[in-house]
A protein has these predicted regions:
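Hydrophobic core
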Residues: 13-21
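Short solvent-exposed beta->alpha transition segments
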Residues: 35-39, 43, 53-102
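Short, low-complexity N-terminal intrinsically disordered segments enriched in polar/charged residues
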Residues: 2, 21-50
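N-terminal export leaders
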Residues: 5-13
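Exposed beta-sheet edge and beta->alpha loop/turn motif
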Residues: 95-146
Length: 146
């Protein structure tokens, strides 16, 4: 568990997109924004499923792309460190939220062993109007899928 927490922290520090939100205030997200945000996350998951490194990398913010340098390095990191995101057995999305200025998409994923994971994506709206993923936090849940 400690190793998982270290990996999670390391990934969060590398991507620079996560921070503690203990007293955060959630703001409403329009139906259009929610659909766009979920579509970006779903598209990246689809790219992971197809081992399409270039497409998966295209959904990351410029900051993430700069941190990893290239699509193959990014995909290798996700494949090795985040198998529940790389190849989830199931995905359920919650309604996105805007919390203290951060756009968050939470999801519950199960891995190939049936372990449940809470996944929080941080997204940014780019100047061109496109949503991009700026980080991802993964925390093990208590349950398992039967």
């Amino acid at each position: 568990m400690l190793q998982t927490r270290r990996r999670m922290l390391s990934f969060a520090l590398v991507v620079g997109g996560l921070w503690a939100l203990p007293s955060a205030q959630a703001a409403g997200v329009s139906a259009k924004q929610a659909a766009q945000i979920q579509a970006v996350v779903q598209a990246q998951l689809k790219a992971f499923a197809a081992d399409d490194a270039v497409r998966a990398f295209s959904f990351a913010t410029p900051r993430i792309r700069k941190a990893f340098g290239n699509a193959d390095t990014f995909l290798a990191m996700v494949r090795a460190s985040y198998p529940m995101v790389y190849r989830p057995s199931s995905v359920s999305f919650f309604k996105p939220e805007k919390v203290d200025g951060a756009w968050l998409q939470q999801a519950q994923m199960s891995d190939e062993q049936g372990v449940l994971w809470q996944v929080t994506y941080v997204l940014e709206l780019q100047r061109d109007g496109a949503w991009r993923i700026n980080g991802c936090e993964v925390v093990a849940s208590e349950g398992r899928v039967a």
